[in-house]
């Protein structure tokens, strides 16, 4: 937050403006910096039995329309500077289905709030909107409810798409 748009393009977004071959090389070397939506799209494809043929991401600056004070950063972000970014990941599959996800992380102005907005286009089109979700609590609950699966997982690296569905566990 606080970067001018041209600084954002140079320091953040330019990392996405590479060829598929360059991206594959970075992934092989462990030097690719994906947004956290990158893994979500792959997970969804795996759970739906889809086969990924290509995946791209784009970082889009979120620009302040007026000065915004951030108590967390203890700074004022001037109008026209970045308040954060949107990560847009587009995944195309062998089956002809495209999954596009976007996650916006930014400093909110006084009239903004967290919102989960999911649209599934198909038959029928479906949209789910959750305004002001308990983001911190949901994130913590997801981690806590995974402890049993992590402890019971096979040795080595296991991706979450290979684990059982993450469900709430009630303990007596």
Show which residues each predicted segment covers.
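Active-site-lining helix/loop region of Rossmann-like oxidoreductase modules
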Residues: 1-106, 110-114, 133, 140
């Amino acid at each position: 937050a606080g970067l001018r748009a041209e600084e954002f393009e140079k320091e953040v977004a330019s990392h996405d403006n590479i060829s598929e071959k360059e991206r594959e090389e970075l992934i092989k070397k462990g030097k690719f910096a994906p947004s956290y939506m990158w893994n979500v799209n792959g997970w969804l494809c795996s759970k739906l039995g889809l086969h990924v043929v290509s995946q791209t991401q784009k970082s889009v600056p979120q620009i302040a329309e007026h000065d915004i004070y951030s108590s967390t950063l203890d700074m004022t972000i001037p109008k026209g500077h970045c308040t954060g970014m949107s990560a847009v990941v587009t995944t195309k599959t062998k089956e002809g289905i495209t999954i596009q996800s976007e996650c916006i992380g930014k400093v909110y102005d006084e009239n903004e709030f967290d919102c989960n907005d999911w649209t599934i286009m198909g038959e029928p089109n479906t949209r789910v909107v959750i305004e002001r979700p308990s983001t911190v609590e949901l994130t913590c609950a997801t981690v806590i409810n995974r402890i049993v699966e992590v402890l019971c997982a096979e040795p080595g690296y296991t991706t979450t798409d290979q684990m059982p569905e993450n469900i709430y566990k009630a303990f007596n």
